[in-house]
């Protein structure tokens, strides 16, 4: 009996899996999970090389993380910021300086969220709107995100409803709430910070030299 089984095993060719048919073991089955490293919204390094000629929305959103290009403001303009938060927020140089201060308070995500919402408002392509809306949610609204902004339950409910049919203005309530928070909470401390005072002095010195 043992010899018969041995002869059968010898007669059966071993089935080897071709290298080309092997399934990659880095496949993830949770592509919708915010904390997953292979999220469908994440641009992998190898994909960046293959799609170098095609712009990606992730790259666009990541560009918000970079300080904005701007011209040097005058001393009068910098001083006027202390009287008008709206005016400072409309000036790229003002936003950059305010952002530098927020970073020291570990609340930079508030301004980044506001900028992302402003970027979303400019979009008209429905597919791009859906992708950017989802990315904003994952980056700043989701409780799983380290950059989650502080919003009340009413605003969160509005956002969750809007996610069913995203539109460029779906985060307006949340954006206004964060804008008000920065104005009332962070802005007064910013004006008393060394960052702002030093910038005022430097611009005043530049104006006197010219």
From Swiss-Prot:
Recorded GO MF terms: GTPase activator activity; GTPase activity
Chain intervals for the UniProt region annotation (Disordered): 1-21
Keyword Transit peptide among record annotations: no
Subcellular localization(s) per the UniProt record: Membrane; Synapse, Synaptosome; Nucleus; Cytoplasm
Organism: Homo sapiens
Superkingdom classification of source: Eukaryota
A Gene Ontology term for the protein's cellular component: neuron projection
Keywords, sorted A to Z: Cytoplasm, Glycoprotein, GTPase activation, Membrane, Nucleus, Phosphoprotein, Signal transduction inhibitor, Synapse, Synaptosome, Ubl conjugation
InterPro entries xrefs: RGS (IPR016137), RGS_sf (IPR036305), RGS_subdomain_2 (IPR044926)
Expression across tissues: Predominantly expressed in the cerebellum. Also expressed in the cortex and medulla. Weakly expressed in a number of peripheral tissues notably spleen, lung and leukocytes.
Post-translational modification comment from the UniProt entry: N- and O-glycosylated in synapsomal membranes.
Pfam families in alphabetical order: RGS
Domain RGS: 84-200
Record PTM Phosphotyrosine, positions in chain: 137
Record-given protein name: Regulator of G-protein signaling 17
Swiss-Prot/TrEMBL GO biological process terms: G protein-coupled receptor signaling pathway; negative regulation of signal transduction; response to amphetamine
Origin organism lineage: Eukaryota, Metazoa, Chordata, Craniata, Vertebrata
Keyword match Acetylation: no
Subunit structure: Interacts with GNAI1 and GNAQ. Interacts with GNAZ and GNAI2. Interacts with OPRM1. Forms a complex with mu-opioid receptors and G(alpha)z/i2 subunits, including GNAZ and GNAI2; the formation of this complex results in mu-opioid receptor desensitization. Interacts with HINT1.
Function summary: Regulates G protein-coupled receptor signaling cascades, including signaling via muscarinic acetylcholine receptor CHRM2 and dopamine receptor DRD2. Inhibits signal transduction by increasing the GTPase activity of G protein alpha subunits, thereby driving them into their inactive GDP-bound form. Binds selectively to GNAZ and GNAI2 subunits, accelerates their GTPase activity and regulates their signaling activities. Negatively regulates mu-opioid receptor-mediated activation of the G-proteins.
């Amino acid at each position: 009996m043992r010899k018969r089984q041995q002869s059968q095993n010898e007669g059966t060719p071993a089935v080897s899996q071709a290298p080309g048919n092997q399934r990659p073991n880095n496949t993830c089955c949770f592509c919708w999970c915010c904390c997953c490293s292979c999220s469908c919204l994440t641009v992998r390094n190898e994909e960046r090389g293959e799609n170098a000629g095609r712009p990606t929305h992730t790259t666009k959103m990541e560009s918000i993380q970079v300080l904005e290009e701007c011209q040097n403001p005058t001393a009068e303009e910098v001083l006027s910021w202390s009287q008008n938060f709206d005016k400072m927020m409309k000036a790229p140089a003002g936003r950059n300086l305010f952002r530098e201060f927020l970073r020291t308070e570990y609340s930079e995500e508030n301004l980044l969220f506001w900028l992302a919402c402003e970027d979303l408002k400019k979009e008209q392509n429905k597919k791009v709107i859906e992708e950017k809306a989802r990315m904003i949610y994952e980056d700043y609204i989701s409780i799983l995100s380290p950059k989650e902004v502080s919003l009340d339950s009413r605003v969160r409910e509005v956002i969750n409803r809007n996610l069913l049919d995203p539109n460029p203005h779906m985060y307006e309530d949340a954006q206004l709430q964060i804008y008000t928070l920065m104005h009332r909470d962070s802005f007064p401390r910013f004006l008393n910070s060394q960052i702002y005072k030093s910038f005022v002095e430097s611009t005043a010195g530049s104006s006197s030299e010219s």
